[in-house]
């Protein structure tokens, strides 16, 4: 074979092994379908839309619920220095008088336990405290002489109570809020129950409260607050501890930052709340959150020192003066540390 023939043969062999010509058959490849991805994206988008609608709907409902809270005209309140925030403000919080059965007739009578509390937030936005005033302590009620504190409400209105406490303490009160304990069961159920501590076993309405920690649902929370075997002042402590337990759980479990739980919790709160007419919707929500934060700190809950003269409960003037100064100077926690006997016990009788 000549060299020329060999080269031509090799060239033909190389051509046959080379790339396919334009006329050669190319294997068919099925295009991958994008339909599953499209369906997934549409589904995800729909879910996101539903979530957004649900969140917007939740906040709209919450705003409506807060707007529906009764507003009360209360004279004697002082406009806050920083109205855009709740820092450096003092709130007067009361409850309807609650007797052993909680009937309307009992709510119009004196002598039953009722909550009178000054809730103060520090000006720096860090901390504060709650000061409970016994409703049966005798003080000067303007226009009525020396009377039990709660009579200021019974004989007048929230305005007279504000005037009485301002005269007693020298503390400017910025806002007023009133709780209705007849609706406490709904709130306790909405947050999934609470825990309270009882120092000794008791029995009320046929329900046994064991010594130590008790898990309360809505109904048993009412039993706890109205136990007829507990005297009035101790029943007041139970109500305060129940309020503290409720708002502690709301804060610790972040129930007001979760859109799912927020609606149910705020709905329950608004059903038992009335506030002064200067309260804005954001003020109310902020108050609930701030109260919850402080509720977890037992050192910031104190009871006004009193003493007994004859058969009457009267202020302990010397200690009380220090407490009023502590409120004005944002130092309730320091007062409680100096005077531990004034700290409200979490284990109410």
Language-model-derived ranges and their functions:
Residues 1-41:
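Terminal targeting segments of Actinobacterial cell-envelope proteins
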Residues 102-107, 147-155, 170-175, 226-234, ...:
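Second-shell loop/turn segments in exported
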Residues 123, 138, 142, 154, ...:
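Sec-exported extracytoplasmic/periplasmic mature domains
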Residues 186-268, 273, 348:
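Flexible, polar/acidic helix-loop-strand segments at domain edges
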Residues 28-125:
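Entry/capping segment at the start of metal-dependent catalytic domains
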Residues 86-89, 111-116, 125-128, 133, ...:
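Extracytoplasmic
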Residues 69-74, 79, 86, 99-100, ...:
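C-terminal solvent-exposed extensions
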Residues 150-210:
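Amphipathic, coiled-coil-like alpha-helical scaffolding segments used for oligomerization/assembly
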């Amino acid at each position: 074979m000549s060299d020329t023939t060999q080269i031509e043969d090799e060239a033909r062999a190389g051509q046959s092994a080379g790339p396919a010509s334009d006329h050669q058959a190319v294997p068919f490849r099925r295009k991958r379908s994008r339909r599953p991805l499209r369906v997934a994206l549409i589904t995800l988008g729909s879910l996101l839309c539903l979530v957004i609608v649900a969140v917007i709907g939740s906040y709209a409902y919450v705003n409506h619920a807060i707007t529906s809270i009764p507003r009360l005209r209360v004279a004697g309140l002082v406009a806050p220095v920083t109205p855009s925030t709740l820092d450096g403000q003092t709130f007067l919080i009361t409850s309807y008088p609650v007797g052993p059965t909680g009937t309307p007739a009992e709510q119009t009578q004196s002598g039953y336990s009722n909550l009178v509390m000054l809730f103060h937030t520090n000006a720096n936005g860090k901390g504060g405290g709650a000061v409970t005033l016994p409703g049966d302590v005798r003080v000067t009620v303007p226009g009525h002489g020396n009377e039990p504190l709660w009579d200021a409400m019974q004989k007048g209105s929230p305005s007279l109570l504000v005037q009485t406490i301002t005269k007693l303490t020298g503390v400017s009160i910025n806002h007023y809020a009133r709780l209705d304990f007849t609706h406490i069961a709904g709130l306790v159920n909405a947050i999934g129950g609470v825990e309270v501590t009882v120092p000794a076993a008791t029995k009320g309405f046929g329900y046994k409260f064991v010594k130590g920690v008790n898990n309360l649902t809505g109904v048993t929370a009412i039993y706890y607050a109205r136990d007829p075997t507990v005297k009035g002042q101790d029943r007041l402590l139970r109500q305060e501890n129940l309020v503290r337990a409720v708002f502690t759980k709301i804060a610790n479990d972040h129930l007001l930052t979760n859109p799912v739980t927020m609606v149910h919790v705020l709905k329950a709160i608004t059903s038992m709340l009335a506030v002064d007419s200067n309260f804005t919707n954001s003020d109310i929500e902020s108050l609930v959150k701030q109260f919850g934060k402080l509720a977890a700190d037992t050192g910031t809950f104190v009871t006004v020192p009193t003493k007994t003269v004859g058969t009457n409960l009267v202020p302990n003037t010397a200690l009380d003066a220090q407490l009023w100064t502590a409120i004005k100077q944002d130092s309730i926690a320091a007062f409680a540390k100096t005077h531990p006997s004034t700290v409200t016990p979490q284990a109410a009788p």
